[in-house]
């Protein structure tokens, strides 16, 4: 018996011309990560917090080796453990199995705790008090980017009511365009600001009286029942929101009963929405019924984690809810009927003055012992684009930089994917990393 390194030493001269492939192998583990979205989301936020702290240390010069080690040890243990002791298939209700699952998730939680404590320490060194109860005060925003750019800035005030607020850049005296929205612990204050590389900015915020609503506008823009469905020149956006949203870069259109009908790139003048099960912003449920016993059925599904008798269902758009609409962003919830779920919705947040869209998927899953998958398609209709995903710590091109003959049904993207054309680059960044 030899180690892999010893084997390579023996065959080194014979494999000089062997092809080199980059990225992780698409296999059961790539699929398994998606089976535990809550724990993975918790773990990946710990990874992001750790990267942020690395940047903040460049400013503070303080390095907490104990917390770094606690994060590193626990994140490694979580990432190394596989998604499934064999007994999770044959004996999912066994106490040993549930204990192993909780123990595994605890590694993610310990890693997150260490990273969060490290971030709190770094923020405290930069002057943060961590909690904001005052209706007027100062906040500091720190860019962790090495590039100059405009970023969304958000902070919340723990209060029952904040009718309006004025935010001023202390350095330039610029009054920022602000949007207030609800937050689980109070009021969220959002605005856009430009930062130099790694710049710190201080802003003063002051409570303001509620703005006076003018009733007589000489324009019919809202009905007596307070529904804003009248085409007018006074409010040129509200009556469009039940059917779509747009900014200078993108336009998204939908229709109840039909779903997403358009995802248009206004800069490139390209329709990016693909038809069928690849439609963007639209969840897909897939189910392989257990017919021959759970262990045998899972053996037969192979690398694609899909039985030959698998059925696929696409979400059916049933409702549209306008959650937020203001000078900084618009947020809309699209509610879908989807097989295998009690509740299924996609929340889209579009910034008015940034070429940026944020979206999240909310799901309440039904319980089943069948083999199931829920997908959010990230495919765009850009046939001339080169597609790359961050996989295994390196960038790889699906179908090109991978072992010949391996599956192409799904990919594990560490940080998302990039569509690159000669004129534009579109980044789809996955925060949950499924």
Region locations from a protein language model:
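Active-site and substrate-binding clefts of carbohydrate-active enzymes
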Residues: 1-131, 140, 144, 190-196, ...
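Structural alpha-beta junctions
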Residues: 1-2, 160-162, 384
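Active-site-proximal flexible loops/turns
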Residues: 10, 150, 369
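Generic structural signal for short, flexible, solvent-exposed coil/loop and linker residues
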Residues: 14-18, 38, 64, 72, ...
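Short secondary-structure boundary/capping segments
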Residues: 15-17, 156-158, 375-380
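Catalytic and substrate-binding regions of extracellular carbohydrate-active enzymes
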Residues: 65, 77-363, 374
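Acidic (Asp/Glu-rich), glycine- and aromatic
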Residues: 353-395
């Amino acid at each position: 018996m030899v180690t892999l390194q010893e084997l390579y030493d023996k065959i080194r001269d014979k494999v000089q011309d062997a092809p080199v492939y980059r990225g992780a192998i698409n296999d059961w583990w790539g699929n398994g990560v998606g089976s535990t979205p809550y724990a993975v989301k918790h773990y990946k936020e710990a990874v992001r917090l750790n990267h942020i702290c690395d940047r903040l240390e460049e400013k503070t010069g303080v390095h907490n080796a104990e917390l770094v080690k606690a994060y590193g040890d626990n994140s490694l243990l979580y990432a190394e453990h596989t998604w499934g002791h064999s007994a999770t298939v044959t004996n999912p209700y066994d106490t040993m199995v549930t204990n192993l699952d909780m123990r595994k998730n605890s590694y993610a939680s310990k890693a997150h705790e260490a990273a969060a404590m490290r971030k709190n320490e770094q923020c405290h060194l930069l002057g943060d008090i961590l909690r904001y109860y005052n209706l007027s005060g100062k906040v500091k925003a720190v860019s962790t980017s090495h590039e100059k750019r405009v970023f969304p800035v958000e902070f919340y005030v723990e209060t029952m009511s904040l009718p309006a607020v004025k935010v001023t850049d202390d350095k330039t005296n610029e009054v920022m365009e602000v949007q207030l929205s609800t937050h689980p612990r109070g009021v969220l204050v959002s605005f856009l600001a430009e930062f130099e590389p790694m710049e710190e900015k201080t802003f003063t915020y002051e409570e303001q009286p509620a703005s006076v609503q003018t009733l007589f506008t000489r324009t019919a823009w809202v009905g007596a029942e307070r529904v804003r469905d009248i085409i007018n020149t006074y409010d040129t956006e509200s009556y469009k929101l039940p059917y779509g949203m747009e900014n200078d870069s993108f336009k998204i259109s939908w229709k109840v009963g039909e779903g997403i009908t358009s995802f248009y790139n206004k800069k490139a003048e390209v329709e990016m929405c693909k038809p069928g099960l690849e439609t963007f912003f639209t969840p897909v449920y897939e189910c392989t019924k257990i017919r021959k016993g759970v262990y045998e059925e899972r053996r037969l599904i192979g690398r694609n984690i899909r039985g030959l008798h698998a059925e696929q269902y696409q979400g059916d758009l049933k409702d549209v809810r306008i959650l937020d609409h203001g000078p900084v962003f618009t947020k809309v919830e699209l509610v879908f009927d989807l097989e295998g779920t009690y509740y299924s919705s996609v929340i889209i947040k579009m910034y008015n003055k940034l070429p940026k869209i944020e979206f999240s998927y909310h799901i309440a899953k039904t319980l089943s012992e069948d083999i199931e998958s829920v997908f959010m398609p990230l495919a765009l209709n850009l046939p001339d684009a080169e597609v790359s995903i961050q996989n295994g710590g390196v960038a790889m091109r699906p179908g090109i930089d991978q072992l010949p003959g391996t599956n192409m049904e799904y990919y594990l993207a560490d940080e998302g994917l990039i569509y690159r054309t000669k004129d534009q680059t579109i980044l789809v960044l996955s925060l949950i990393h499924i």
